[in-house]
């Protein structure tokens, strides 16, 4: 059996796209966050543009990345993520606005929980169905009992 030919290293190729003035650690996290948006899109956890995934920028505890308002999850890229400060001011120029509701929720979490590096907020069909029930998730069925105590 002959060895498999060397595959191009995708991360090396993506590193070549990093803006010259961007910290390599931040670029890597931007790539991972953009990929996370794509995974959520593939799973159908998007509810158009009204869910958010944010990531604290390393070395800047009051700054995080959020998706640009108006773009679908499959359009989010490492380059178009918006870098914003906890007080709502932009941390860098961006051609895209930020969803105010998403900012309010995520800035509150990032401001209160410095150990929360990534915050994910979504409205899945199953999650919303449980949230709409007066008694929430009851543990009277096999599948819901698996979540007892969690």
Identify the role of each PLM range.
Residues 2-150:
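Glycine-rich flexible loops
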């Amino acid at each position: 059996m002959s060895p498999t030919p060397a595959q191009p290293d995708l991360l090396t190729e993506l590193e070549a796209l990093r803006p010259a003035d961007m910290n390599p650690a931040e670029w890597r996290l931007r790539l991972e966050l953009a990929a996370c948006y794509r995974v959520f899109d593939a799973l159908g956890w998007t509810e158009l543009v009204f869910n958010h995934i944010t990531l604290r920028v390393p070395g800047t505890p009051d700054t995080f990345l959020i998706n640009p308002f108006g773009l679908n999850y499959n359009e989010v890229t490492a380059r178009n993520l918006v870098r914003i400060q906890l007080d709502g001011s932009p941390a860098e120029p961006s051609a895209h606005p930020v969803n105010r509701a998403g900012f309010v929720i995520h800035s509150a979490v990032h401001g209160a929980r410095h150990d929360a590096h990534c915050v994910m907020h979504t409205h899945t069909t199953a999650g919303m169905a449980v949230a709409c029930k007066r008694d929430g998730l009851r543990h009277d069925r096999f599948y819901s009992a698996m979540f007892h105590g969690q």
